[in-house]
Amino acid sequence: MVNKKKSNLWENIFSDDFHQKNKSIESFRQIGGFNNRLTSWDAIETSSRYFKSLLYAFAENLDNRILQSVIFHQKDNRLGGGIKYYLKKIKNRSLGRPITINYYNNIVDLDYLLSVEEIFFLKSELRKSKNILEIGPGYGRLAHSILQNFKNIKNYYIIDVDWMSELTRAYLKRVLSSSDFSKIEFISFDNYQKFKKRAEVSNQNLIDISINTNSFEEIEENIVRDYLLFISNNSQYFYSKNAICKYHPNAVDIKLKDKAHYEAALRMGLCKNVIDIYNSQAIAKQRKVYLKAYCPKNFKLSKDEKCFGQFLYYHSALYESKNS
């Protein structure tokens, strides 16, 4: 005999006044509509399920890319072995209590997964480099990852504003060995001019690779161009991983409290076109603009790749000096 008793769960759902008001056939699939209780999660919600799902998918994607690469020649080619090759060398990644997932016994957080993607992209160049410059490194995740994966690095120069450098210095001092930490030279924005003069008197390029990830897009255009000119004169390679465009908050259902913040963001960086970041044709067109905009004078594009998932409107590009 079939039990015709209603589920208590569904009785509660159908008696919910909110859902009674949101069952219109014209709108039941929109954000906040009744369909989020039937076939899918709501597009906007307060849990971490979407973030963790994207993190897992990113780990899977990157791990497969590494394992299938012609430059990856490791005995451990099982699932998880690709990202493990880099992550296992990066100690103390849990500082700061990041959100993590477990991918084939790799405890993965987003920041260090991004770092693995970046050092894998730059692997060939990093192996032969001694001097690295990173402009605007955030709290230092990439510096941490590079210094622990590439022991050939002798000097790691970091340029940032003073208040951010305080966090970077404190973080890296905690996670790095004293010998690796001693390789870092912190250069305040105010001391950048002295660093430029020091580079000018050098008989050869002071920097092997200059790096900027996710910050040139947030800096005034004239400052970005000044950095690119310095890189052009003093570096063999330049690696950029920045947003290729701007987007309107409505595209991701953000309700602005202060339009001044958005208007200020539109003035930053070199790529200021506002596009639909979920339109493949618009992204493909804007990538060409980005690749040209961030190429230093007398440099050429060496290689590039699109970014994954929530970073699909970002792009990795490595430029090489024509004089190298």
Question: Where do the model's predicted regions map?
Answer:
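Conserved beta-strand signature within the Rossmann-like core of class I S-adenosyl-L-methionine
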Residues: 235-247
